[in-house]
Amino acid sequence: MGASASVLTGSKLDAWEQIRLKPGSKKKYRLKHLVWASRELERFACNPELLETAEGNEKLLQQLEPALKTGSDSLQSLWNAIVVLWCVHNRYKIGDTQQAIQKLKEVMGSRKSADAAKEDTSARQAGQNYPIVSNAQGQMVHQAISPRTLNAWVKAVEEKAFNPEIIPMFMALSEGAISYDINTMLNAIGGHQGALQVLKEVINEEAVEWDRTHPPPVGPLPPGQIREPTGSDIAGTTSTQQEQIHWTTRPNQPIPVGDIYRKWIVLGLNKMVKMYSPVSILDIKQGPKEPFRDYVDRFYKTLRAEQATQEVKNWMTETLLVQNANPDCKQILKSLGPGATLEEMMVACQGVGGPTHKARVLAEAMATAQQDLKGGYTAVFMQRGQNPIRKGTIKCFNCGKEGHIARNCRAPRKKGCWKCGQEGHQMKDCRNGKQANFLGKYWPPGGTRPGNYVQRPAHPSAPPMEEEVKGQENQEQKGGPNELYPFASLKSLFGTDQ
């Protein structure tokens, strides 16, 4: 109890004992309430020593406040006691617990407003056009670009030349810069003078277009008013730093000359990128053994340098990415369908062209060939000697089904000969329906004769004897009675030739 009682001493303890528990109540806070609060905090796994300071009380209130909606009356009483103790530590004059809660809400509300105003101020300061900064007197002054930024820009141009990634590099380093700073960055480049000359031509064209679309006002300017910027003023050749700052930061109709000049530079950089990257997106094709990931990297790097709108680039991606892939990847990509994402494509084509993919393709090809030749050898390997090639489907002698031979048949093995069904011999030695030759041997299975035998039986060319006799009888019926001896004349020998 001594440790708990040491939370408040002296005048703070006197102020604590003058606060009522409820408005209009006679009961007031006592030392026993501090002891009870300490024990409750230990029960809730909180540190009771936090009650000794105002900051500790705020931490306890922040931790207990989320549980008030679903907490018990004991938790609500603990939270009220800590609020009153927080007011005592801060020496706020309160009369009861309700006033302490109202005081806490007022203080927390004012803190939130101050934090919001501070964030708004910092956001406005961050939104100012750096390197245009405000000095102590509130005037807008220019802060020169740092040597580190120039060094990073020069090193990027030397290493990357004018690859597509040089454009976002320029945009990042020249953020908020005025025309004077941008010209400093361009003058720091030692090489690539031909490319810089192309850039200057683009800047001159854009300056002429600006003068055409923004003609200067007719007549003299009012006193104290600065002139409107021309194309050469935006390029920084005929304007000073103070004029550029004034055009950018003036309250009425500001003109961000630095941002406009950056857009002109980007147009020139796009032409330079196209000049240094002459490869067309149509020429980017995946090699036979090139991984799909490397092909995608080359494709998008070239697409980045293309001078086209985003809609055209999307069409190129949807069409050419699949069309220029190698046959293996193209077959996989077409099976995914037209709505597949790039992530799905890269996952599906992962490993294509490598040893694992080659082994899988070879295994699939062998499985297909084995399925076509299921049941044994082809007819070419089954022929023996001069026997003709067997055509048609293969038929099993064991079960009688087509598509496999008896060697690979899964049906139970049939006993005996597969042709006649008798036991004691095999089908190749079966004599059922066979004819023996003059040596007493049977013809080979299949019914065909050896190669040195005539494969087809010989048929006589003369007409049969029955047809000859029948023809002579018909001829006798047609003859007259005078021909008693038809065989005695020459006509019987030569027919109608006499």
Curated annotation (Swiss-Prot):
Span(s) of short sequence motif LYPX(n)L motif: 484-493
Residue ranges, annotated region (Dimerization/Multimerization of capsid protein p24): 276-362
PTM statement from Swiss-Prot or TrEMBL: Gag-Pol polyprotein: Specific enzymatic cleavages by the viral protease yield mature proteins.
Zinc finger (CCHC-type): 394-411, 415-432
Cited Pfam families: Gag_p17 (PF00540), Gag_p24 (PF00607), Gag_p24_C (PF19317), zf-CCHC (PF00098)
Positions of disulphide bridges: none
Keywords, in A-Z order: AIDS, Capsid protein, Host cell membrane, Host cytoplasm, Host endosome, Host membrane, Host nucleus, Host-virus interaction, Lipoprotein, Membrane, Metal-binding, Methylation, Myristate, Phosphoprotein, Repeat, RNA-binding, Viral budding, Viral budding via the host ESCRT complexes, Viral nucleoprotein, Viral release from host cell, Virion, Zinc, Zinc-finger
Residues covered by region (Interaction with host AP3D1): 12-19
Span list, region Interaction with membrane phosphatidylinositol 4,5-bisphosphate and RNA: 14-33
Motif segment (PTAP/PSAP motif): 460-463
Positions of the UniProt region annotated as Interaction with Gp41: 7-31
Record region (Interaction with host PPIA/CYPA and NUP153): 187-225
Feature type site, description Cleavage: 130-131, 362-363, 381-382, 437-438, 453-454
GO cellular component terms listed in the entry, alphabetical order: host cell nucleus; host cell plasma membrane; host multivesicular body; membrane; viral nucleocapsid; virion membrane
Gene3D superfamilies named among the record's database cross-references: 1.10.1200.30, 6.10.250.390, Human Immunodeficiency Virus Type 1 Capsid Protein, Immunodeficiency lentiviruses, gag gene matrix protein p17, Single helix bin, Zinc finger, CCHC-type
Motif placement: Nuclear export signal: 16-22
Chain positions covered by the region annotation Interaction with membrane phosphatidylinositol 4,5-bisphosphate: 73-77
BP terms from Gene Ontology: viral budding via host ESCRT complex; viral translational frameshifting
Compositionally biased region (Basic and acidic residues): 467-476
Locus of motif Nuclear localization signal: 26-32
Modified residues (Phosphoserine): 146
Entry text on domains: Late-budding domains (L domains) are short sequence motifs essential for viral particle budding. They recruit proteins of the host ESCRT machinery (Endosomal Sorting Complex Required for Transport) or ESCRT-associated proteins. p6-gag contains two L domains: a PTAP/PSAP motif, which interacts with the UEV domain of TSG101 and a LYPX(n)L motif which interacts with PDCD6IP/AIP1.
Family: Belongs to the primate lentivirus group gag polyprotein family.
Protein name: Gag polyprotein
Biological source species: Human immunodeficiency virus type 1 group O (isolate ANT70) (HIV-1)
